[in-house]
């Protein structure tokens, strides 16, 4: 079933310029709707960890992108909160009290999640935004005015602080989603975009900006990473001097490494303030 679905999505992607809400064949509509439904329930996800590596299911991401070519904008409500005009329904628009009880997570008004996103048990959505294709795992807090971009993968027991921006894959078009692994803390107003991976047990301080071109400097080893924060890193905003010493450019600095045991026992303030 999955292989046939993947083949149909891949072919539709090749023919995407010819697709429109009026011209799309029913089999393509049904295939895309099937994928979005399985993303919504958590049965499918855009990226999965296999061993130590993340594997991106590009065909699922293609289905998310195709969904925008198959629907016209239409008026819709977010649980009676307001009227909107969009292609993608909100996740909770038609949910009952039983649906919320079975799902087992909290949603604080006026949080919005789009249909096709998955929210796991014991997660908390403060007034925030979760886009289509995103996966928010168990016990994670999405704090006030944080945004989880399209197809982003957020692990277990993650804290996305107020105003955090997790980039998506739709605009601008990205090859891979942002991934925040288990037990990470992302400080207020930080941004993680362009498919950057923050590995497990890492702490990102307030106001750190991470993209594929951002230098991530390990002050203990002198090593520079791109696109990946190693597991157990404590990261703050910083600068590195130019080769001629005339100016400096923004970077992120790994000030120390901690293991999971230390991370669990030590307060965030101690980790960020300690030498």
From Swiss-Prot:
Substrate binds at residues 106, 143. Coiled coil: none annotated. Keywords: Acyltransferase, Amino-acid biosynthesis, Cytoplasm, Diaminopimelate biosynthesis, Lysine biosynthesis, Repeat, Transferase. GO terms for cellular component: cytoplasm. Its main location: cytoplasm. Signal peptide: none annotated. Its EC number is 2.3.1.117. GO terms for molecular function: 2,3,4,5-tetrahydropyridine-2,6-dicarboxylate N-succinyltransferase activity; nucleotidyltransferase activity. InterPro entries: DapD_Trfase_Hexpep_rpt_fam, Hexapep, Hexapep_transf_CS, THP_succinylTrfase_dom1, THP_succinylTrfase_N_sf, Trimer_LpxA-like_sf. GO terms for biological process: diaminopimelate biosynthetic process; lysine biosynthetic process via diaminopimelate. Transmembrane segments: none annotated. The keyword Amino-acid biosynthesis applies. This is 2,3,4,5-tetrahydropyridine-2,6-dicarboxylate N-succinyltransferase. The lineage of its organism: Bacteria, Pseudomonadati, Pseudomonadota, Betaproteobacteria, Burkholderiales. The gene is dapD.
